[in-house]
């Protein structure tokens, strides 16, 4: 399988896409979340002067099993997988 290149200014995903991603918390716990892309930052939000990949703000409808929606910001493109319908 060929590795996808994450190119600043050329995002792989669009607003409205259903995606999955993992987050690692400060306690070391890693959780997987499904959500919908709300905002695309084509040049990323991490490396302002030298962007390496786009980032996304993703709406998770059931944050950590609480039933509460949460907008998770600045998720790097390399951490996201599209959910096929």
Q: What spans do the regions from the language model cover?
A:
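Intrinsic-disorder/low-complexity loop/linker signature
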Residues: 10, 27-29, 43, 67-68
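Intrinsically disordered, low-complexity, charged/polar segments
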Residues: 53-85
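Mixed-charge, Lys/Arg-rich low-complexity intrinsically disordered regions
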Residues: 1-18, 22-25
